């Protein structure tokens, strides 16, 4: 089984552009609606794939601000320092500076343009590191 997070944005096209510039995602597929909004896209970072689209009535309400969301996305990256600098240069709202953790990871956190909380670090879950 695989888990593929799905994120819906008010401006999915803008979000995709930001995720590419700030966090290094690569767009694998993109399908637009007749009105030009993004119906479905697939973005990859390393071995991980997430799906991004435009929020639509009946599908999922897109909040005005994700700052109160109780979920975030954590991605392990190889060159965390370079990733952090790239995110900062692209205008990501860094909410937690680079830091070492007591569980052996180095991490930082940032929000994208619509407030989705992203976490990046060197931690690899134990089940995956075996």
Language model feature labels by segment:
Residues 114:
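C-terminal catalytic core of tyrosine-transesterase DNA break-rejoin enzymes
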Residues 1-6, 16-111, 120-130:
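Vicinal oxygen chelate
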Residues 9-13:
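Short acidic-aromatic low-complexity motifs
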């Amino acid at each position: 089984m695989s888990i593929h997070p799905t994120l819906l944005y008010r401006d999915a096209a803008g979000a995709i552009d930001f995720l590419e510039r700030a966090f290094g995602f690569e767009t694998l597929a993109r399908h637009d609606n007749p009105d030009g909004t993004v119906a479905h896209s697939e973005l990859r970072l390393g071995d991980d794939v997430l799906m991004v689209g435009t929020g639509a009535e009946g599908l999922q309400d897109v909040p005005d601000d994700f700052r109160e969301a109780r979920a975030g996305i954590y991605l392990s990256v190889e060159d965390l320092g370079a990733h952090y600098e790239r995110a900062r240069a692209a205008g990501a709202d860094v909410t937690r500076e680079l830091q070492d953790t007591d569980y052996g990871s180095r991490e930082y956190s940032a929000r994208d343009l619509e407030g989705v909380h992203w976490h990046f670090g060197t931690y690899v879950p134990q089940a995956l590191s075996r």
